[in-house]
Amino acid sequence: VDVGGESTRPGYTMISDEEEISRVVPVVEKIKAEFDIPISVDTYKSGVAKVAIDAGADLINDIWGFKYDENMAQVVKDGMHNRKEMDYTDYMNDVLNDLKESIAMAKAVGIDDNRICTDPGVGFAKTYEQNLEIINKLEMLNTLGYPVLLGTSKKSVIGLTLDLPSDERVEGTIATSVLAVVKNSLFVRVHNVKENKRAILMTEKILGKY
């Protein structure tokens, strides 16, 4: 379960660490008390990450991959691709190189390989066409040697493709989840868990993955 206290969609308004903590920590504590499942906290702020981990978070989902907050590498356990600019010279190679930099930063502070996964950051500093390309070429991330996570749930790339509002993007999300399985990604981050799980299980059965 991924818990976030601040929206990171395009045009979002930044909130203070204190406000974000007040939103996130009670939810983490409540989930941890009632369910035995891994909890991820979506934050790019090291102060929030530290408090979240103390509250029981198992993973930190940093959309900037350690590059926004210089202290984040000390606490983060999950990296994702994002950058401030959309100026890519060689799109896929730039994405891979950015992720390699984030991985190197994680390893430099002693984060074990088995605590790292890579996320191409669909919807972050990418055009519509680039988002489609990264999903289509998702298997290239496997060359980095780490599990791949795809997070496309209800994102604008689906809305723009199907001309649908966010609450009607379930089927589009499922399509990307199925493709993630085909491309050998180990994780997807979604809102509608039941529907996506069923589609993924069926896809895995067809592919002989279980």
Where are the language model's segments positioned?
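Active-site-adjacent loop and "lid" segments of alpha/beta metabolic enzymes
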Residues: T8-S46, I53-D54, D58-M105, V109, ...
